[in-house]
A protein has these predicted regions:
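GHKL/Bergerat-fold ATPase module
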Residues: 1-13, 22-51, 55, 63-66, ...
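A generic alpha-to-beta junction signature in SAM-dependent methyltransferases
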Residues: 69-72, 114
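Conserved ATPase-coupling elements of RecA-like P-loop NTPase cores
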Residues: 72-73, 106
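A conserved short beta-strand within the histidine kinase catalytic ATPase domain
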Residues: 74-83
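Flexible ATP-lid and adjacent glycine-rich G1/G2 motifs of the Bergerat
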Residues: 92-165
């Protein structure tokens, strides 16, 4: 199921449980009525995929997985399996997770920029705005998401063909060398997640550059990912070089122990966390999505030795909000805070 060829398209006339045909029809109609709308969608998708979210593939996959587990009320387990290219099949990254399965609201969210279905998930949810999934476009032109036998996929080739049939888009397509906002045009898919998981995101690699980026991001997985996403209990990174497992658990005294099979010993993290409600006037000039979650939280985390003395963290020296931003942090600790961000997580 984690190979690209295991994701299939239902035969014509079969049920379309996520109403992808309706979503495509609405988008194509809007593009036909206004080439400016097509241009707006294309620019927005490119900005996210090639700009702010280009290097956030693993973080966004983990964040979506953690939020799905939060919705289901279960601990999140995430397995990232990388298959090398074989014969005529491209290299593939498969991200399988436990948690709430794919539903129609999630499909619409994935296919609609800045229209997240997570607004009612409560303060434990991390995802915002519905833009994070665009990170998959940094490495793949054929992403798919399936759970419990049904799913959704996207295809640049098929999206290009659909857009070519829309009157009035010929000039735009030529100007963009045939690139179209493919996430706006979902297609039905069939398949299932590996045993013991609920959902899998399948990403056939576009080219060698995509493979290199994915390998670098997989190698960069560290303790900060599990500390930033408290419901993320386990991450397994399975590549041709071997299998690496990271887990987190709370131990006596409230410290968090992160065990990494690639490390010589576990790391014990001491956390101090504060949080509360935000006064409405502090959010008056913030986007609606933020005003619907009027809470704040701040956590400092420091690795400690057996005698309790602090050590310098080996995590990236940047502010986490709660996942990494590009804001540098010059203090020898890990900062996780609900700071306001723009859509590119700056």
């Amino acid at each position: 199921v984690t190979r690209a060829g295991a994701i299939s398209t239902p035969a014509e006339g079969h049920p379309d449980p996520f109403r992808t045909a309706e979503l495509r029809r609405a988008v194509l109609t809007a593009w036909g009525a206004s080439a400016a709308r097509f241009r707006e969608d294309a620019n927005a998708e490119e900005d996210l995929a090639l700009g702010g979210h280009r290097d956030r593939l693993i973080i966004e996959l983990a964040q979506n997985a953690a939020d799905a587990a939060t919705r289901a009320g279960v601990p999140c387990r995430l397995r990232l399996t990388y298959h090398e290219a074989a014969d005529d099949a491209p290299a593939v990254l498969a991200a399988a997770n436990t948690g709430a399965p794919l539903d129609a609201a999630a499909v619409e969210s994935l296919s609609t920029l800045r229209a997240s279905a997570k607004r009612d998930d409560g303060p434990a949810a991390v995802g915002r705005f519905g833009v994070g999934f665009a990170a998959v476009l940094a490495v793949s032109d054929e992403p798919a998401v399936v759970s419990h036998g049904r799913g959704v996929r996207w295809s640049l080739t098929e999206a290009r063909a659909m857009a070519a049939e829309v009157p009035g888009l010929a000039d735009e397509l030529r100007r963009r060398d045939g690139h179209v906002p493919l996430l706006r045009l979902p297609l039905p898919a069939e398949g299932g997640a590996p045993d013991a998981y609920d959902t899998v995101v399948v990403l056939p690699m576009r080219d060698g550059a995509a493979q290199d980026l994915t390998a670098r991001l997989l190698a960069a997985v560290d303790d900060a990912l599990l500390l930033a996403l408290p419901n993320l209990a386990e991450v397994v990174v399975d590549t041709p070089a071997g299998v690496r497992t990271l887990t987190r658990r709370t131990v006596e005294g409230g410290d968090v122990l992160v065990e990494d099979s690639a490390a010589a010993a576990p790391t014990r993290w001491r956390l101090v966390t504060e949080g509360g409600a935000l006064a409405p006037e502090l959010l008056a000039d913030r986007p609606v999505e933020e005003r619907l979650r009027p809470v704040w939280s701040v956590a400092w985390a420091v690795p400690v030795a057996a005698d309790g003395s602090p050590a310098a963290p080996r995590t990236a020296p940047v502010v986490h909000a709660p996942t990494p931003t590009d804001e540098p942090l010059g203090l020898p600790a890990l900062l996780l805070a609900s700071l306001p961000l723009d859509p590119t997580r700056r």
